[in-house]
Each structure stands twice: as structure tokens, then as C-alpha cells.
């Protein structure tokens, strides 16, 4: 019956999760079209590959479609959704389309509140180095591939599994990874943390009887669900009880070096493994990838080479290099997608480790009013650890403002805490200039957030604001 579906239309085709699936479908030979509110690198790439992409949503866009793919960000009052429903065109959730792709391959699904994109990228890179030619769909741009998706000829499909809308429960992988479990996207789970944890259990229970759950031993919430999982479990982490663990860890010039111990009856050691990423959190991400690679029998030489040569993921501790400071000298510019206090803390710790003794300047844009409200005190705590802070207004992501959960409220709370004096930047368009006014020679500047702040480092690096 699948041959009846020839043209697939994506509503919001430029989104991180949507564009990757669209790219794989283009490469599978489907006629792909899509609409989005704005032009982006993702939409331009898809156009170059032959997809028909239009700006703006209109009922006419779906006239020739056999199926409509939507993310949870697309509302029922979208004109394309209304038109598809009137024409009885199937409306397919993004995760369901990913699940269809996964049925064609052996799926490796990476879940967890933090670290999904980096871990998925590491797994894809290791499998590629091991000549397994994987298909991958990633929530960020894998620098080595120049894309966030690729159709491979091998047996495996590596993808992120999204818990934010519980859509990961549609996937049927053969290997599932859970990096950690934290309180985020709690609206989906009725603000009930027990329900969130149960969703992860249900996700792992979707594994077949021969499947493997790769779980982080260091995360207390992941550890707490292990007894509820009736599948083979491989534990990874820094803990001595992990099956795959790291020892002799040291930071060196923005990289991490460590030994890997694999305990499975006998013990094997990989000495002096080099990971071309900073931070203990990335050591854990690498251990998860090593665990997966070991399960699918990637040679150790390929694992070691892929980790040492890993060139990163777009907006995950992405280094823009040295930028001229207006007052003379230069500053180091880094961009990161972090938007939850836990991942922000890990990234800032990684920066301290990679650049010891240097002043750390953070330009941060909070993402969603609900997250700002739910994690308010944690944001105050983590933002108080930097040496200088430029704070933007909350990126709404479609949400209505919430009283006492906006940028000004966060700025006031930080002043009361007294550890850092924030500079509030109401319009994100003014952020590049605000950074240049605050920066000194030798500083490390990190732009951080999941919203429109992603455009700021490019402007700083190209000296647009200094012209």
C-alpha cells in the first residue's frame, strides 16, 4: 500500500526534527513539499535537494499531498491542517513518520532530558567510522556530515527519541538509550514527575525481547526505573557499578582524555581515549555511544578514531574561534543550545575546565515562560555562577507571557541574589552590541538558548556589529 503515497507535505518543514525526516524521505525517492514561516539553512538545503518549500501556510499548499506531516507545534487551526482534514488527507505526527522509517531499519533511539543530540551524533559518527553506513536523524547539524540527517545503506537508523510530547512511545527500536531524566516539559505529564518516569519505562518496554536498554548509572532517576525494565540492561557512567565506565579522566585543551572499562564477565580496558569535546557530561555521552557501538560490534579502533576526530554538532558548544574585541585584543566565542538549568550548568562547567582562569561572559535567552516559571530558582542559581551576564527577554515559543516569569523578573531576582549584576537586553537584536560593550580581551563569551539568540554568534563572528 505504501506505493500509493507519493507526495508528502511537511507543515513547519524547517524545524530541527522535521527537516531531517524530510531529507531522508527525499533521498528515498518521495516527492516532498513543505511550508514554514521563515527561510533557514534547513529549508534552503531541502530546496537544493529538490523539495518544494514555500513560505507561509496556505490551504493551497496541500492540494497535491498524499499525506501531511505535523509536529506538536502545529495547531489544529493551521489552514493546511484544516484543508487536509477536509480532503481526508492523512495527518501524520512527526514521530509516527520517524517510526515508519525506523521499521525499515534496526532502530537505535536516544532518549533523555539532556544530551540527546550530542549522544545521537556520537553514535552516528562511530557507526560511520566502523563502515556501518547508518541512517541518522538528529536534532542538530552534525558538522562532519554538514547535515542533521542522512540516508545510509546500512542496517541501522540512529535517531533522537523525544519525550517532550511523549511521542517517543511511537518508536520501536532495538537499542534504546536513556541519558538522564529531569523535570522538563512537565505540562505533557500533568506536572507529575512519576508520570514522566513511567513514560520512560514504557519507552524501554517497547524494546523487543532481544533488545538492549543502555542506561546511565550516574543519574538517580534513571537508576530508579532500572528494576522496572524487563529487558537486557547495560549500565554506563562514572560509577564503579557501571558496566561501561570511565577512569583516569582529565581535561586537556578543550578535550577529555580517559580510560574506558567494559565489564561483562571479563574486563577490557581502552586506555587514553580522546574525546574531542569538553566536560564530564560529554564523557557520559561518549560512554553511552561506546556502549551502543560495543553492542553492534563496531571495532575498537573505529570507536577511538571517531571520538578523537568528532567535530561536534551545530549549537552544542560550537566554537566560533577568536573574535576581535572593540577595546583591543580578542575574545573566544562559543555558542550553545542549552536552555535548561541542568544542561547549562554542565556546559558552563565544561567551559571553566576548557578555559581555566579566564573571565566567563554569558549571553542568555530563556526559552518558554513555563520553563522559566518552573525552573526559576535553578536559573537564578546557575546564572549567578558566571562572571558577567547579558540576559535577554524570554523567547516565547508560542506561549503567552506569565507574570513574574519573564526576563525582567529573572534579572531582578539575580540582583537580589547579589552574585552577578545582569545587563537586561529587552530586544534580542541589541544583543550583539551589548556583548561587544561588555567584553574584554581574553574573555570567553558563550551565547546560549534555544530561541532566536542562535543568530547572535554569527553576527559577532562576522564583525557585523563592528562595521
Swiss-Prot record:
Q: Which protein is depicted? A: UDP-N-acetylmuramate--L-alanine ligase
Gene encoding it? murC
Listed SUPFAM superfamilies: MurCD N-terminal domain (SSF51984), MurD-like peptide ligases, catalytic domain (SSF53623), MurD-like peptide ligases, peptide-binding domain (SSF53244)
Q: Which domain of life is it from?
A: Bacteria
Tell me the route in metabolism or biology where this protein functions: Cell wall biogenesis; peptidoglycan biosynthesis
* Localization (cell): Cytoplasm
EC number(s) on file = 6.3.2.8
Q: Which organism is it from?
A: Azoarcus sp. (strain BH72)
Role description: Cell wall formation.
Amino acid at each position: 500500500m505504501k506505493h500509493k503515497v507519493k507526495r508528502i507535505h511537511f507543515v513547519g518543514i524547517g524545524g530541527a526534527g522535521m527537516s531531517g525526516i524530510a531529507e531522508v524521505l527525499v533521498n528515498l525517492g518521495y516527492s516532498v513539499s513543505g511550508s514554514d514561516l521563515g527561510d533557514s539553512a534547513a529549508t534552503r538545503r531541502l530546496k537544493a535537494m529538490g523539495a518544494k518549500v514555500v513560505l507561509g501556510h496556505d490551504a493551497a499548499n496541500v492540494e497535491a499531498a498524499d499525506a501531511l506531516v505535523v509536529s506538536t507545534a502545529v495547531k489544529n487551526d493551521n489552514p493546511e491542517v484544516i484543508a487536509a482534514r477536509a480532503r481526508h488527507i492523512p495527518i501524520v505526527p512527526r514521530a509516527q513518520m520517524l517510526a515508519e522509517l525506523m521499521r525499515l531499519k534496526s532502530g537505535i533511539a536516544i532518549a533523555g532530558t539532556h544530551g540527546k543530540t550530542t549522544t545521537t551524533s556520537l553514535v552516528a559518527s562511530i557507526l560511520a567510522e566502523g563502515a556501518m553506513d547508518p541512517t541518522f536523524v538528529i536534532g542538530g547539524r552534525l558538522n562532519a556530515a554538514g547535515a542533521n540527517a542522512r540516508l545510509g545503506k546500512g542496517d541501522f537508523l540512529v535517531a533522537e527519541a523525544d519525550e517532550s510530547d511523549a511521542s517517543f512511545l511511537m518508536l520501536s527500536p532495538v537499542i534504546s538509550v536513556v541519558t538522564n531524566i529531569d523535570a522538563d516539559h512537565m505540562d505533557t505529564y500533568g506536572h507529575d514527575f512519576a508520570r514522566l518516569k513511567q513514560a520512560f519505562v514504557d519507552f524501554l518496554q517497547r524494546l523487543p525481547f532481544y533488545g538492549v536498554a543502555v542506561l546511565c548509572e550516574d543519574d538517580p532517576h534513571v537508576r530508579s526505573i532500572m528494576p522496572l525494565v524487563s529487558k537486557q540492561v547495560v549500565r554506563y557512567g562514572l560509577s564503579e557499578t557501571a558496566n561501561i565506565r570511565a577512569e583516569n579522566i582529565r581535561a586537556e585543551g578543550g578535550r577529555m582524555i580517559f580510560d574506558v572499562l567494559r565489564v561483562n564477565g571479563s574486563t577490557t580496558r581502552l586506555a587514553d581515549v580522546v574525546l574531542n569535546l569538553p566536560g564530564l557530561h560529554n564523557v557520559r555521552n561518549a560512554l553511552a555511544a561506546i556502549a551502543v557501538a560495543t553492542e553492534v560490534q563496531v571495532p575498537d579502533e573505529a570507536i577511538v578514531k571517531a571520538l578523537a576526530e568528532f567535530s561536534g554538532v551545530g549549537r552544542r558548544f560550537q566554537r566560533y574561534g577568536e573574535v576581535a574585541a572593540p577595546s583591543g585584543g580578542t575574545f573566544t566565542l562559543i555558542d550553545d543550545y542549552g536552555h535548561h538549568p541542568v544542561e547549562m550548568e554542565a556546559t558552563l562547567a565544561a567551559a571553566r575546565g576548557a578555559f581555566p582562569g579566564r573571565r566567563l561572559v554569558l549571553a542568555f535567552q530563556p526559552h518558554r515562560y513555563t520553563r522559566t516559571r518552573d525552573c526559576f530558582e535553578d536559573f537564578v542559581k546557575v546564572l549567578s555562577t558566571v562572571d558577567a551576564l547579558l540576559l535577554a527577554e524570554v523567547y516565547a515559543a508560542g506561549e503567552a507571557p506569565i507574570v513574574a516569569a519573564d526576563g525582567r523578573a529573572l534579572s531582578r531576582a539575580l540582583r537580589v541574589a547579589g552574585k552577578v549584576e545582569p545587563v537586561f537586553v529587552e530586544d534580542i537584536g541589541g544583543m550583539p552590541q551589548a556583548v561587544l560593550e561588555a567584553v574584554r580581551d581574553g574573555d570567553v563569551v558563550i551565547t546560549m538558548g534555544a530561541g532566536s539568540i542562535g543568530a547572535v554568534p554569527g553576527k559577532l563572528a562576522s564583525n557585523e556589529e563592528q562595521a
